[in-house]
C-alpha cells in the first residue's frame, strides 16, 4: 500500500488533498493583442465570461528579448501577441486583474528569467 497521500509531502500524488474532485482543471485562454491595454481588455472580458486562467501570447520581439524600439523588431511589434518592453507594460497588462485568484501562463522561452526577475 502506498503511504503517500495527495496534498502531503512529497506531493507525488498531487499538491491538493482532493485534487480535481473539488476543483476542475484550469483551462487557460491563450491571448495577446497589439498592446498591453488591448490585451488587458480582452483578459478582463475572458475573466468576466468565466475563464479561470490566462495564457499570455507575446509578440516575437518580446519572445527573443528585443525591446519594441530595437531595429530588429521593426515590423514585428504586436503582430502575433502583446509587446512587453518595460515593467509598465506588464502593469498595464494586468491592471484590474485579480492575479491572486487566477493562474497565468507565460509562453515565453529565451527571456523567461528577465520577466520572472522583474516580478520578484
Predicted region positions:
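Gly/Ser/Thr-rich loops at beta-strand to alpha-helix junctions
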Residues: 61, 109-114
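Conserved small/polar residues in nucleotide/adenosyl-binding loops
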Residues: 115-120
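A short, small-residue-rich loop immediately preceding and capping a beta-strand
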Residues: 102-109
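Acidic/polar, glycine-rich intrinsically disordered N-terminal extensions of enzymes
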Residues: 1-88, 93-100
